[in-house]
């Protein structure tokens, strides 16, 4: 796989997954390393996707930590960890998903799709246990992207503007943080009047 097909953020995620594999003394870069770096990325797309699904992100990270602690370790070989066969399959699935979505580059959300689609890894099981499946990811992604496609290597920056600078009023209302409308008849009437005005020709 050619890494120049990845967005800048996706390249960074793969690099951090490799760093995490070195840190955990793993002989391979696994799907669990990849998922941990995706979920930990605060300025990425994965956290907003999972938040829209109401997923316990810290719960996922805790499970990943437990899995990574149990993984086999190697010491003193001086060799870089290699990409596991399962992770190679995830990259292939992610690329297929990017093609299906007519995206020109493989971005971080495609990596999340790939993990969810490749059902044999512990990372995929952790996602399933938290109710994260491919169809749910796609629905959440559509809301975040707003119809935009990945046409360059900085695509995530562009379609995250809405997430970063906007506010999801549905979530705010569900959390009970919206001001009540009771007793504000004049304001409501005025808003309806403004919204229902026809444009003069």
Regions found by a protein language model. Give the residues of each.
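Histone-fold recognition with a strong bias for associated Lys/Arg-rich disordered tails
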Residues: 1-201
């Amino acid at each position: 796989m050619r890494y120049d097909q990845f967005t800048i953020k996706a390249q960074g995620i793969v690099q951090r997954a490799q760093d995490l594999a070195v840190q955990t003394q793993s002989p391979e870069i696994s799907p669990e390393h990849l998922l941990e770096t995706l979920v930990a990325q605060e300025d990425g797309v994965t956290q907003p996707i999972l938040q829209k699904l109401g997923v316990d992100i810290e719960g996922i990270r805790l499970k990943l930590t437990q899995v990574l602690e149990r993984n086999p370790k190697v010491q003193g070989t001086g060799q870089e960890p290699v990409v596991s066969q399962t992770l190679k399959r995830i990259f292939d699935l992610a690329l297929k998903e990017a093609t299906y979505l007519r995206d020109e580059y493989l971005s971080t959300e495609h990596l999340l799709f790939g993990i969810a689609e490749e059902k044999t890894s512990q990372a995929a099981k952790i996602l399933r246990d938290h109710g994260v499946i491919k169809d749910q990811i796609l629905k959440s992604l559509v809301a975040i992207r707003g119809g935009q496609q990945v046409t360059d290597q900085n695509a995530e920056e562009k379609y995250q503007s809405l997430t970063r600078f906007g506010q999801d009023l549905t979530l705010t209302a569900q959390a009970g943080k919206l001001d009540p409308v009771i007793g504000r008849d004049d304001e409501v009437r005025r808003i309806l009047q403004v919204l229902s005005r026809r444009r003069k020709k």
